[in-house]
Amino acid sequence: MRHKIITFILAVVVIIIIGNMIGGGGGSEATSKTSSSSKAETEKTYNIGDTVKTEKTEVTVTKVEDRDTVGTQYVEKKASEGGTIVAVQYTIKNVSKKPISSFSIPTVKLVDADGTSYDSDIDASVNYATETKVDNSKILSDLNPNIKVTGVKAFEVDKEAYAKGTWKLKFSNDVIVKIK
């Protein structure tokens, strides 16, 4: 009986270790750093309002604002103490001849001057979509050829760091847009 218990405990520990190795174990807001300065030097940076064409998409960041709250009187998200919410609106158009799977639509990260990237705040993003009347669910669907959709994201970051630093949006298709 004792051998079975020890075997069971070891199996659970091995599963946890394997899960952490596969999943990366990350739950923090700052998810990664840029690994190579030479890569950063070769990446072209665009500005708010520029339409950037890639092989499959056209991406345009249309609006960026930092706020203390996002949402409406019924659904509101306030920034944490010492934080600010960076709210972003953008469009993505499929310029290819085939539908783009929802899993292949570019994701968006906020990146500071040190290369640390930040994930969006889900609650703040939903509340900002409600406030701006943007149907964010369209970003979650397959995108057919010549169709353009609007998306919104909201990121919560340190207010002081945001006020002082240079910030960019990085799309997973390597489009980088300087926002501050």
UniProtKB/Swiss-Prot annotation:
Q: Which residues cross the membrane?
A: none
Annotated gene: yxkC
Tell me what this protein is called.
Answer: Uncharacterized protein YxkC
What keywords is this UniProt entry annotated with? Secreted, Signal
- InterPro entries annotated for this entry? DUF4352 (IPR029051), Immunoprotect_excell_Ig-like (IPR029050)
Q: Which residues form the signal peptide?
A: 1-30
CC annotations in GO: extracellular region
Q: What is its main location?
A: secreted
Segments for region (Disordered): 25-46
Outline the inducing conditions: Transcriptionally regulated by SigD. Negatively regulated by TnrA under nitrogen-limited conditions.
- Which Gene3D superfamilies does this UniProt record tie to the protein? 2.60.40.1240
The answer to keyword Secreted applying to this record is yes
Low complexity composition-biased segments:
29-39
Cellular location(s): Secreted
